Amino acid sequence: MQSIISEKPRFDEKLISIAADADAFEGYSAGHSVRIAEMVDSLGLAFNFEPHDRLLLQQAALVRNIGEMQMNRDYIRSGRVLSSEERLDLQRHPVIGEQAAAKMGLSRGVQLIVRWHHEWWNGSGYPDGIEGDQIPLAARILRVADTY
């Protein structure tokens, strides 16, 4: 039986560069998004995802917050509690990220994982407020890894 830790994923250098820029923009330590991509890959393997589906999940993990970077709002990096208006504005970032992923030529699957990576099982997430099994497993896996 193959260990879920033993298989290290290989990531596209362009996506790693985008992830590094997003990590720096948000004030995360270097390699934050790569670690999340490795985590979702391990979880995808544990859930018996096909290699192609694991690749989509890895790609989504690397570009999940590109929408925040493209919004380029100072409050994202402020470290303070956001106002109601700022929170509402920030909730647009998954849709902006979905559009950016499309412009980059990433698959529709990656685009949708990026769009739904802030959805919650109880329907309180954003941008669409979908709930339960309406949220694809890949998006749920990314939500957990990103929160962890």
Language-model features: locations:
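Histidine- and acidic-residue-rich, metal-dependent catalytic cores
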Residues: M1-Y148
